[in-house]
Amino acid sequence: MLITVSGPPGSGKSTNAAGLADRLGLDHVSGGDIFREMAAERDMTPVEFNEFAEEDPQIDRDLDRRLHEIATTRDDLVLESRLAGWLSADHADFRFWFDAPVSTRAERIAEREEKPVDRAKAETERREASEKKRYREYYDIDIGDLSIYDAAYNTARWGPERFIDVLVATIDAYDPATDEGKAPIEGVSYDF
């Protein structure tokens, strides 16, 4: 089973994808971890690296190619990244979108990265604008189009343990006999 988890920074992707993978006995791959490793290799913050990526499209393409290869060649995995749902094409069994109010996301990021909330919020908004622009330019993806996802959740409504219960219940309720089909991924062009 391939499950993708996508959403904006601070939406709980990493925490909940790791918890879901653990609960289901699946592997977990985080695009955010890969991106942060790439930033650290260049001695940059994720925000600086995002801005650098605007000038060097190969950075996004390298990351996205790796994630696409993982999504299309592996099973028994929870793949988590901003574009995981899109990059998995039709290979994903479930595509989830996580979100939360920007104030909540900024608080989470501030706590994780040990920085002031107002700084985390400003950086998050810059990062999101940067990513939205690049995804449209590179692949013709409208990151705000949630129609490809099987379910979208506001993660601010549950704590992580309870939210994983919600996700597992969603997966358990799935009945292949009543499945009328996944939302297709159309109109995008992957140029890695």
UniProtKB/Swiss-Prot annotation:
Q: What reaction does this enzyme carry out catalytically?
A: CMP + ATP = CDP + ADP; dCMP + ATP = dCDP + ADP
| Gene Ontology biological process terms from the UniProt entry | pyrimidine nucleotide metabolic process
Where is this gene product found? Answer: Cytoplasm
Q: Assign the protein's first listed, main location to one coarse class.
A: cytoplasm
Q: Which residues bind ATP?
A: G7, P8, P9, G10, S11, G12, K13, S14, T15
Q: Which Pfam families match?
A: Cytidylate_kin2
Q: What domain of life does the native source organism fall in?
A: Archaea
Enzyme class (EC, first level): transferase
Keyword annotations for this protein, in alphabetical order, are: ATP-binding, Cytoplasm, Kinase, Nucleotide-binding, Transferase
**Single GO MF annotation:** dCMP kinase activity
Q: What EC number(s) would the UniProt record show?
A: 2.7.4.25
Q: Which GO terms describe its cellular component?
A: cytoplasm
SUPFAM superfamilies from the xrefs?
P-loop containing nucleoside triphosphate hydrolases
Q: Spell out the InterPro entries in the cross-references.
A: Cyt_kin_arch, Cytidylate_kinase_dom, P-loop_NTPase
Q: Which family is this protein grouped under?
A: Belongs to the cytidylate kinase family. Type 2 subfamily.
Q: Which HAMAP family match?
A: Cytidyl_kinase_type2
**What is this protein identified as?**
Cytidylate kinase
Q: Which organism is it from?
A: Halorubrum lacusprofundi (strain ATCC 49239 / DSM 5036 / JCM 8891 / ACAM 34)
Gene from which this protein is expressed: cmk
